Amino acid sequence: LSRGLGDVYKRQVTGPMKVDCIYRRIDDNFLDPKVFYKHSLLGVPGLFKCWRKGNVGIVNAPGTGIADDKAIYSYVDKMIKFYLDEEPKLKQVQTFLCRKKIHKDHVIENISKLVVKPTNGSGGNGILIGPKASKEERENMIDKIKSKPSDYIAQPLEILSTTPTISEEGIEPRHLDLRPFVLTGKKSWVTTGGLTRVALKKGSTIVNSSQGGGSKDTLVIER
């Protein structure tokens, strides 16, 4: 990609082609070396200026990475009440913020019953599933929590639903979760359907593709 005259272009053999929208998964800091990390080789110089002018769309938009911080889980129900003045129809899973001493003490004392996650983690990396972890793994996590409590949250282990999945042994149940998508323009709406992620490893509850997870088509029987 390159920038010219306030627009973004894709380089092609036949000549440059104007780009209307960019789907990105890299961090904000790497988007534009003129605005953020100056040594970035992933971004496009001047991209941020084009975006601010409205000449190109970026999905996910700069700034939306705040939703990737797992500490925000603790505030979901409060945000619904604050912005919509409604009670959530589906309650957020109870979330303990280890940066709060009372929460940290509870997590350390009950780590064998909880799932501990790094607040800035992704791809299922760094997660400790307390009921399945060894004593040594739990002790190592406790040391990490004590060292940098603000880097971790914890939640009760939720029992995920299962779906029939073809394996080497035949059709077997595998754990899954459903990730819906909310689109926002002049108004906001939830898409019909979503991304169903499946833990392909037997007994696993980690659905992330980077950890061996897969995906399935999502069929909405009744709306």
Task: Annotate each language-model stretch with its function.
Residues N125-S161, T165-R223:
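ATP-dependent carboxylate/phosphate-activation module, predominantly the ATP-grasp catalytic core
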